[in-house]
Amino acid sequence: MMTLRDLINKLLGRETSSANTARERLQLVLAHDRVDMSSLTTDLLDKMRKEILDVVAKYVEIDFEEVAVSLETEDRMTALVANLPIKRTISGEIKFKKTDKANKDIKK
């Protein structure tokens, strides 16, 4: 894919710099990565969800009715987001810290 800058450089007889070549290669890699994300089928996501839940369930009791696993894309980055409400640890009560907006630790 030739950019306008590449076309002007070619018409003026300038050689392509290694920076331009590297930039073009990086753009191809990024485009390839984006295409690969589209290959995540519903079946594959379901398998990933099941495996994640199986691993987490070894250590904590999960509220399976409230579990949500999704793919979210923002600014060319795709993230697998898993919201797993935890009832308690397998050995007993769950212990955790919450941090409020003023960065003060609140223990529950």
Swiss-Prot record:
GO biological process, one term: cell division
Keywords in alphabetical order: Cell cycle, Cell division
Gene3D superfamilies recorded: Cell division topological specificity factor MinE (3.30.1070.10)
UniProt xrefs under InterPro entries: MinE, MinE_sf
Function text: Prevents the cell division inhibition by proteins MinC and MinD at internal division sites while permitting inhibition at polar sites. This ensures cell division at the proper site by restricting the formation of a division septum at the midpoint of the long axis of the cell.
Recorded family membership: Belongs to the MinE family.
Protein name: Cell division topological specificity factor
